[in-house]
Amino acid sequence: MIYTNDYESPLGNILLAGDKQGLTGLWFTEGSRYTGLGLKKDARRCETDYFDQTKEWLGIYFSGRNPGFFPRLHLVGSDFRNRVGEIMCEIPFGKTVTYGWIADQIAKERGLKKMSAQAVGGAVGHNPICIIVPCHRVVGSNGNLTGYGGGILRKKALLELEGNDMNQFKIPTKIGRAHV
């Protein structure tokens, strides 16, 4: 059974999804390419302990503070995507890393000389639990604020909320509808 709930954030409404193990999805409902991707029609709206934890986490986060805990998460995906998600959860509040840095971490773990930053980008881009699994903290090697499921302007807003110096980043001059 899939459960859903909503949260109204300063950046727009957020859809929460989960199963009996924990939170499986968190998406902005407007302007997001992946909102509810894979949710079944029989998903049931309800309250759960992990939705309560998630709403508490989001409330602290949107007040500009590091929540200091994670709600109960259930990462659903391939081993590679889940490992990328775990690494993203280790990126400190107010810090950023590059796709290449994550690729280097995975290459070291697997005893490889190199790992594709593009493969990491694909995994980051399919992160179903935005904000909490902080894909917004992953940037291009040249400082570009590359794709974000909730839109580049939301990615920028989240990084600003965390106190990042935005002068170090480049924002695309052409922002399409999917990036707003």
Predicted features, each with a name:
Residues 1-24:
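DNA-contacting interfaces and partner/effector-binding or oligomerization modules
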Residues 3-10, 56, 65-177:
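Nucleic acid-binding interface residues in structured DNA/RNA-binding domains
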Residues 15-16, 25, 98, 147:
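A sequence-level detector of short linear motifs
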Residues 20-70:
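Compact structured core domains
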